[in-house]
A protein has these predicted regions:
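Charged, flexible cofactor/metal-binding loops and thiol motifs
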Residues: 242-312
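The feature captures the beta-strand-to-loop junction immediately N-terminal to the Walker
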Residues: 40-41
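A short, proline-enriched helix->beta-strand linker immediately N-terminal to the Walker B motif
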Residues: 174-178
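ABC ATPase NBD Q-loop/coupling interface
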Residues: 68-90, 246
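P-loop NTP-binding/switch modules centered on Walker-like glycine-rich loops
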Residues: 181-185, 189-271
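ABC ATPase nucleotide-binding domain helical subdomain, centered on the C-loop/LSGGQ "ABC signature"
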Residues: 126, 130-145, 152-153, 256-260
Length: 312
């Protein structure tokens, strides 16, 4: 199968007080047409920076330090485009849509939500104002905003957090992108609203053929919605597997530690969760071997320096 998106060895750095912080250090992954994948990891693992890097949205003091990004087996490396050039703007929103982490602050408070969606449609699809307005209302209906016609003229602060996130999804899908990146898209919402939005995104993906990358720290979300999972830790991919295989037979000690540390409904009463001792390494001084090595309790720990990233 031809890959829809292929990311090769992407690196992102931040320079602070003379130190180079390698936030993302050689991450590679791929996405197939119509597929939903998950990228999971704890806070600070580099998930969001990876996604921002492939769209060249990293601003100073950060920079994309290397790597390649290809769409549909194309010959052009997206990272070779000028960050603010026309080609990169066509990719952002037009080919790859992104739902950002903060629905409360990602919408412009002085413009109506309808206008913000309409503007995206006019820019990427080339529709006139009236056609773009009709398309924007259609998108609001698609994400189940009640009375979409009148709420086209509402401002962000007139909606609840869950409704704002629906609007963010509508905006990300408005230009009919082939790929949707959902970066912690439901983190600040209650579990019922989370489930509703994730099921809605899954349904929309099936209807439109859109591929989705779910970026989250919540293993339960990717267990239910993703077909494949990439596990990130300290700027690296530690493990990649099909969802069922990863939960049944995790290979890397870090993945095994994560699964031992989360509660499950099927757990017997009184089961004690096992935390992972220690802290992630300083990304400004990360070792050249497996970054989980100092915290690893695996019997294969002595091989970790040789066998990174799979030392389990």
């Amino acid at each position: 199968m031809d890959k829809l998106l292929e990311v090769r060895n992407i690196k992102a750095q931040f320079v602070t007080d003379g130190n180079v912080v390698n936030a993302v250090d050689g991450v590679s992954f791929y996405l197939n047409p119509g597929e939903i994948i998950g990228v999971v990891g704890e806070s600070g693992s580099g998930k969001s920076v990876t996604m921002m890097s492939l769209l060249q949205l990293i601003s100073s003091p950060g920079r994309v330090a290397g790597g390649e990004v290809y769409l549909e087996n194309g010959k052009d490396n997206l990272l070779s485009y000028p960050p603010n050039g026309e080609k990169m703007r066509e990719v952002r929103g037009g080919k790859i849509g992104m739902i950002f982490q903060e629905p409360m602050t990602s919408l412009n408070p002085v413009l109506t939500v309808g206008y913000q969606i309409q503007e995206t449609i006019m820019l990427h699809l080339g529709l006139d104002k009236e056609a773009a307005r009709a398309k924007a209302v259609e998108m609001l209906k698609l994400v189940n905003i009640p009375d979409a016609e009148s709420r086209f003229g509402y401002y962000a602060q007139q909606f609840s957090g869950g409704m704002r996130q629906r609007i963010m999804i509508a905006m990300a899908l408005a230009a009919e992108p082939e790929i949707l990146i959902a970066d912690e898209a439901t983190t600040a919402l209650d579990v019922t609203t989370q489930a509703q939005l994730l099921e809605m995104m899954q349904d929309i993906a099936k209807k439109t053929g859109t591929s989705i990358i779910i970026v989250t720290h919540n293993l339960g979300i990717v267990a239910q919605y993703a077909e494949r999972i990439y596990v990130m830790y300290s700027g690296h991919i530690m493990e990649h597997a099909g969802t069922k295989a990863l939960f049944r037979r995790p290979e890397h000690p870090y993945t095994r530690g994560l699964l031992k540390a989360i509660p499950r409904l099927s757990d017997p009463k009184g089961k004690v969760l096992v935390p992972i001792d220690g802290l992630p390494p300083n990304p400004a001084n990360r070792p050249p071997y497996c970054p989980f090595y100092p915290r690893c309790e695996s019997s294969e720990r002595t091989d970790a320096k040789r066998a990174f990233p799979r030392c389990g």
